[in-house]
Amino acid sequence: MIPLQRPPLTDQLEAELARRTEAIRKAGPTTATGRAAWRTAREPKARLRTLLHRMTPGLLRCMYCGDNLGTDIDHFEPIARAPLRTFDWHNHLLACAYCNSNQKRDRFPTDPASGTPLLIDPATEDPADHLLLYLESGAYQGLTAKGHATIDVFALNSRAELVRGRRLAFTVVKALLRDWHTRTTAGDHATAAEIADALDLLWQADVVRAVYRLTDNRPLAEVVLGPEAFTALTALT
């Protein structure tokens, strides 16, 4: 999971979403009215999906697990809990079908004392404040209550394919960095530029970001990456 930038709505789309929200309010804001309104909103959903595609890490990856293709518009705060947020642009994220339908569903843990959400919203906060990714193992450690809840709801550590995918992605990133170093040293700057672009499009954007963050601790980065990959990383950041 990485931080994301939410683009603004057009005035036309913002007005359309507000109109549909008001219709839910007038009909009675229930789970049923919210879901019915969402099912029939084909054209606004298509435009929202286009905007969400602009936010996604890598090649249209799920904003939660980062591993699978983002196919579903997820309501961060579920319709069952907040029907009036059905058409709230700030409540929409792109999820894979598995995270949306099998893991999160209507789950939305909150702090029992304050009522604040305990899931990380990557569009409003930096997941690295709550999650630490161990690159060698591919596993996450929760640093806060939000981090622990997010790991639990999306099964970020208990889905073996996610952990293995992150671990293998780290191997790929190191190989690409070494190749970038080799190509640059040989004067093949065109291929080196393609490699740098490939790093930005890897399916596991959280792994790439965790590698870039190693520059905060350069002695550790050199040990973890090796000399050639470390040299490439320092040149690219």
Q: Where are each of the predicted segments found?
A:
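Histidine-centered nuclease catalytic patch
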Residues: 61-94, 98, 103-118
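Short, charged surface segments at domain edges that flank catalytic/cofactor-binding sites
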Residues: 18-61, 83-86, 90
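C-terminal, charged low-complexity interaction regions
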Residues: 154-237
